[in-house]
Amino acid sequence: MWQSFRTRPFSRTPALGSEAHSIFVTATDTNPLSAEPELVISEYAELFVSGLTVINQLTLGKTYVCTRDDSRVPGEGIPDVEFKQFKGPHPAGLAGTHIHMVDPVSENKTVWQIGYQDVIAIGHLFSTGQLMTERVVAIGGPRTSSPGLFKVRVGACLDDAVMSSSPNLDNARVVSGSVLSGRGSEPTKNYLGKFHNQITILEEGNHREFLGWQKPGFDKYSVTNIYGGSWLKGKLFPFTTSTGGSKRAMVPVGTYERVMPLDIL
């Protein structure tokens, strides 16, 4: 279970014998179509508390449990375990955001991060002496016929995992993880990633639209109001894997600064 921890900076497995200034438990998730961690933790409340107690002994500093502002996660009262609440859209649920706001790292200061399901697995190991071989994942996306939460094996084959929810995968891309940071299924990488709590299924955007740039775009989503679809508030759009064109330069017009919570630009 040691590889469940990741160092910040650099997101590496901690060296044996190393020590963290603090440990961050990510118990919130703002990725699109992700599961609500509170629901999963409630099914394994005792194991989660047991896991918190174990990992809290790995640092002389504090263990921060980062949750959504209105969630109720067990573990209050454990010495040196402090709960931090975050509110807002993605990336409010990312460990990097939490660390930047609570205990920023530097070249001489390292913290560790671990996901809530790995905390449950550690609690299971120390409570039963056996490895936990299952994980709860959210399966969703425009090509999913029956989205929901499913229990799958750790490292499960992606095609097998989505078979019950999406039997037809023609011209679809199965993504291990979020559409924002996940990994597309490939013949040699057709398995659930170690740190992924969701599987997303998208339509392959492998077709070109003739003179699409001249159309009003009422069927397209837009953040910057360049398409007519931006007038249709509340409408859901079936996203595909298309990026709408080739790679382009990042032009400093303030768009990225509005969605970047960290002071790095």
Question: What do the predicted segments below correspond to?
Answer:
Residues M1-L265:
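Buried, small/hydrophobic-residue-enriched core segments of structured protein domains
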